[in-house]
Design a protein with these regions (language model features):
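ATP-dependent NMP and nucleoside kinases share a basic, alpha-helical "lid"
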Residues: 81-88, 92, 104-165, 171
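Extreme N-terminal, non-catalytic leader segments
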Residues: 1-41
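Hydrophobic anchor at the beta1->P-loop junction of P-loop NTPases
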Residues: 44
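Conserved lysine of the Walker
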Residues: 52
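The conserved Walker
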Residues: 48
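Conserved substrate/cofactor phosphate-moiety recognition/catalytic segment
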Residues: 57-105, 109
C-alpha cells in the first residue's frame, strides 16, 4: 500500500522561503525497533453522522489496549485549534485535509498509529493525504464508512442535517455540498449494519496485513 521511497519526509513540497528539510540523525527503522512499534495512518471518511468517530474511538482503544501507540484525530476537535481559522468552503476543506495529513504523517513517522476521522468529501484531497504518506514510505489505510444518507439524517445528533435542509447551514456535505465516495477504499465498513467493534477489528486486521506486506 506504499511505494518504495525514502524513510524521511517529503522535501519537494511548497515550504517557507529559505527553509530546508532537516534530516534526523535517528533513522525511522532504529526508532521503531527500539520502541518496538510501527507507524501508520488510518483515514476514516464518510458522510456526517456516518459513524466515523465511533469506529475511530473503538479502534484507538483496541490498539492501545494491545500496547500499540495510537491517537484519534477527530475532525471536529482539530477545528478547535489546528484548523480553527478555516470554514467549509472547498478551498478551506482542502487546506484542512492538507494540515491534518501532515500531522498524521509526522505521528506515523514517530511510530504511532494516527487515526484521522474527517468527512474529507473530495477524492483529490484524500489522494493528497495518501501521497504524503507514500512519498515517505508510510502505510496509509483509507477506510470508507459507508452509511446511507437517510440513516445519517435520522441520527443527526447535532441537528446539522435539519439546519442544512432548512437553508440555515451552507456547504453541508450530503445536502448542499457533494460527497465523493471512495471507489477502492482499503477497508469498507458499513455504518448502518456493523457494530463499531466489528468495524474496528476489520480495520485492525487490514492494518496488520499492511505492515507485513
Amino acid at each position: 500500500m506504499v511505494r518504495q521511497a525514502r524513510e524521511t519526509g517529503p522535501r519537494e513540497e511548497p515550504h517557507s522561503p529559505g527553509v530546508t528539510w532537516h534530516e534526523s540523525g535517528l533513522r525511522r527503522s532504529r526508532r521503531w525497533s527500539r520502541l518496538r512499534t510501527r507507524g501508520a495512518t488510518v483515514w476514516l471518511t464518510g458522510l456526517p453522522s456516518s459513524g466515523k468517530s465511533t469506529v475511530a474511538s473503538a479502534l484507538e482503544a483496541m490498539l492501545v489496549e494491545d500496547g500499540i501507540p495510537a491517537y484519534f484525530l477527530d475532525g471536529d476537535n482539530l477545528r478547535h485549534g489546528l484548523s480553527g481559522d478555516l470554514a467549509f468552503s472547498t478551498a478551506d476543506r482542502t487546506e484542512n485535509i492538507r494540515r491534518v495529513a501532515h500531522v498524521a504523517r509526522l505521528m506515523a513517522d514517530s511510530g504511532m498509529v494516527a487515526i484521522a476521522s474527517l468527512v474529507s468529501p473530495a477524492h483529490h484531497d484524500r489522494a493528497l493525504a495518501r501521497e504524503l504518506h507514500e512519498a515517505a514510505r508510510l502505510q496509509f489505510l483509507e477506510v470508507y464508512v459507508d452509511t446511507p444518507l437517510e440513516v445519517c439524517e435520522a441520527r443527526d445528533p447535532k441537528g446539522l442535517y435539519a439546519r442544512a435542509r432548512a437553508g440555515k447551514l451552507l456547504d453541508f456535505t450530503g445536502v448542499s455540498a457533494p460527497y465523493e465516495a471512495p471507489e477502492q477504499p482499503d477497508v469498507l465498513v458499513h455504518g448502518a449494519t456493523e457494530e463499531p467493534l466489528v468495524s474496528a477489528r476489520k480495520i485492525r486486521v487490514a492494518l496488520e496485513d499492511a505492515w507485513v506486506s
